Design a protein with these regions (language model features):
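Multi-pass membrane proteins that catalyze or facilitate reactions on polyprenyl-/lipid-phosphate substrates
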Residues: 1-61, 65-205
Length: 205
């Protein structure tokens, strides 16, 4: 995510009042999402559908990813892990002519989640692609600046060093730099940033 921030930031041609306002708007949205309590409302069919639309827009906009947006919304595990696993197990059972899954409410719910997410993604691709392309073409600076602010503000939502109490309240903390675990985390953090930056440079060669 930090690597994506670096890449997208340098797409800003210049910093002026308009781009500053855009960064502020994006930063505010990102911070609100990062500090929002109980953002996960994954049981709602409508939310799952819109999650698909939002996730696919992350694939269209530079510097964002659908998985990252799902993580921020709190439904990454439900959609990308649980429902995908449910599909795999279901297909495996169908091949084995085992149809007992139709009596499993949890399995059927997860398959429904995957269908809703897929329909939402397709709808988002059709609905958002032209709009986002137009924004990037005609209002590139303000669009990019909002994305830059959003990425910066939402970084706290994926901060790896956090504690959660029995009530679900999350608090962030600064890691202990005397431990091997911290330096291992920082090493892979650096590798991830380097990988994204190198990919971007190779793409422009």
């Amino acid at each position: 995510i930090i690597g994506s921030f670096y890449v997208i930031y340098y797409q800003l041609e210049k910093i002026n009042v308009k781009t500053f306002v855009g960064i502020t708007i994006g930063l505010t949205i990102g911070l609100l999402i990062s500090f929002a309590d109980n953002l996960e409302v994954a049981n709602s069919s409508l939310i799952i559908f819109f999650s698909g639309m939002i996730a696919i827009s992350g694939m269209i906009l530079p510097g964002l990813s659908g998985s990252y947006l799902l993580l921020l919304m709190g439904n990454y595990t439900l959609i990308m892990v649980d429902s995908v696993n449910a599909l795999y197990y279901t297909l495996t059972e169908i091949v084995s002519l085992n149809f007992e899954f139709i009596n499993d409410p949890e399995r059927l719910y997860l398959l429904k989640v995957l269908v809703l997410f897929t329909v939402g993604s397709i709808s988002g691709l059709v609905f958002f692609s032209n709009i986002l392309s137009s924004l990037l073409k005609n209002h590139k600076s303000i669009t990019i600046s909002i994305i830059v602010g959003f990425i910066a503000g939402s970084l706290l939502g994926v901060w790896p060093w956090k504690n959660e109490d029995i009530y679900g309240n999350v608090s962030l903390f600064i890691p202990d730099f005397t431990t091997t675990e911290t330096w291992t985390t920082l090493f892979f953090l650096f590798i991830g940033i380097l990988f994204v930056v190198l990919l971007e440079r190779l793409a422009h060669k």
